[in-house]
């Protein structure tokens, strides 16, 4: 991003650049920690206006400190890069050992709404392979430029227009006789004609609700007895992120919630995120319910259909064949069908049903992912929604 130095003699807020830099560092810190923050159980199913607190490490100024009063100094071999640290004595900090007397690391909290968190996460993502259908009801938020203005934020700086305004000012300020600049600054010499604030132009942006194509997302979740609290929490985290993404990016997308044990039923948003059940598992029941809803309300001719299923893979063995058949039928009518297997822990040999899916589902629009811990939720969802992913291969993402 270009930075223009204002060389005018008009009084200026000198702390503005410091505030801008501080804000960038804070936002960068938030983005780095969002993956684990968004999966916290305390915010699952909450309102988008609910505020959450995010811990951020203090941003310290560079300073000189006293050494250890030992002979010699730290030295490098000439191949160091910015940010490298010289080896030295172990520092005081967390862990075993004697107490230290150095200053601790400053940590403070900032408040941010769930909606702002979601915007950070999914700003550059969209539903994959969305195609034009006969009916158009889906609205997508977009922005278009409507001319220029004198004030604005740095990302909206119109560089070419700003240069044109500077040239116009320069031409207008020349003396008609010898062309000497009236406004040149002695510090730079008369050959230099710097930018001033009056030269800068910014794009005027207007939010526009772009009319797009029909889309429905079917969220299928296993709520059987084998899905303990940890597994259900991970599954709900996945669907919570998916649901918030859809609310952010699309105005009229339909979302259908399906919960299943040995039988399946359509539920509302609150029941889906907060209600638990028990019993056995027939994965095919969830798929058959989804196919039933599609046939009754969402014709593939008119709708872009996306189906996602989360389960621990502990399916009744006699149901595996039927589950594979139903999954293949879903692939035939869906733009994308994603299966997420919830297996907490690091030791995972893969379930029977997942192996059945990978071996017997040949559709290119099928993808399988693993979610082992809460930090896996966001990367797993992004892999499913990544439009740039290879569409020519059936993927088993991990």
Swiss-Prot record:
Region (Disordered): 1-22, 68-104
Domain of life: Bacteria
Cross-referenced Pfam families: DUF444
Skewed-composition ranges (Basic and acidic residues): 11-22, 78-95
Coiled-coil residue windows: none
Similarity field: Belongs to the UPF0229 family.
HAMAP family documented for this protein: UPF0229
PANTHER family assigned: UPF0229 PROTEIN YEAH
Name of the featured protein: UPF0229 protein Ccel_0490
């Amino acid at each position: 991003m270009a930075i223009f130095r204002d060389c005018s003699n008009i009084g200026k807020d000198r702390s503005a650049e410091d505030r801008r830099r501080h804000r960038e560092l804070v936002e960068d810190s938030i983005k780095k920690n969002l993956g684990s923050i968004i999966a916290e159980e305390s915010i699952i199913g909450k309102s988008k206006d609910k505020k959450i607190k995010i811990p951020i490490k203090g941003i310290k100024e560079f300073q000189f400190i006293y050494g250890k009063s030992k002979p010699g100094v730290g030295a490098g071999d000439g191949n160091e890069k910015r940010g490298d640290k010289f080896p030295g004595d172990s520092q005081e900090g967390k862990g075993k050992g004697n107490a230290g007397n150095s200053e601790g690391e400053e940590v403070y909290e900032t408040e941010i709404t769930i909606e702002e968190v979601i915007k950070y996460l999914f700003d550059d993502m969209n539903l994959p392979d969305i195609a034009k259908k006969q009916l158009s009801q889906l609205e997508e938020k977009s922005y278009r430029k409507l001319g220029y203005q004198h004030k604005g934020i740095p990302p909206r700086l119109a560089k070419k227009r700003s240069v044109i305004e500077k040239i116009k000012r320069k031409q207008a300020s020349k003396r008609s006789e010898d062309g000497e600049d009236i406004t040149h600054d002695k510090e730079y010499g008369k050959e230099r004609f710097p930018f001033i604030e009056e030269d800068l132009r910014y794009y005027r942006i207007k939010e526009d609700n772009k009319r797009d194509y029909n889309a429905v997302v079917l969220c299928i979740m296993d709520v059987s007895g084998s899905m303990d609290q940890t597994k259900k929490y991970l599954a709900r985290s996945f669907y919570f992120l998916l649901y918030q993404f859809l609310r952010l990016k699309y105005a009229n997308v339909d979302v259908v919630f399906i919960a299943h044990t040995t039988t399946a039923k359509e539920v509302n948003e609150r029941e889906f995120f907060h209600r638990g059940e028990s019993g056995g598992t027939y994965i095919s029941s969830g798929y058959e319910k989804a196919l039933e809803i599609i046939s009754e309300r969402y014709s593939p001719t008119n709708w872009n259909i996306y189906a996602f299923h989360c389960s621990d893979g502990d399916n009744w063995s006699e149901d595996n064949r039927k589950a594979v058949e139903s999954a293949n039928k879903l692939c035939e009518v869906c733009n994308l069908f994603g299966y997420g297997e919830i297996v907490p822990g690091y030791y995972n040999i893969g379930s029977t049903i997942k192996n059945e899916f990978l071996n017997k589902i040949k559709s290119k629009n099928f993808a399988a992912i693993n979610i082992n811990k809460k930090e896996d939720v966001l990367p797993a969802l992004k892999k499913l929604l990544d439009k740039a992913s290879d569409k020519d291969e059936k993927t088993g993402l991990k």
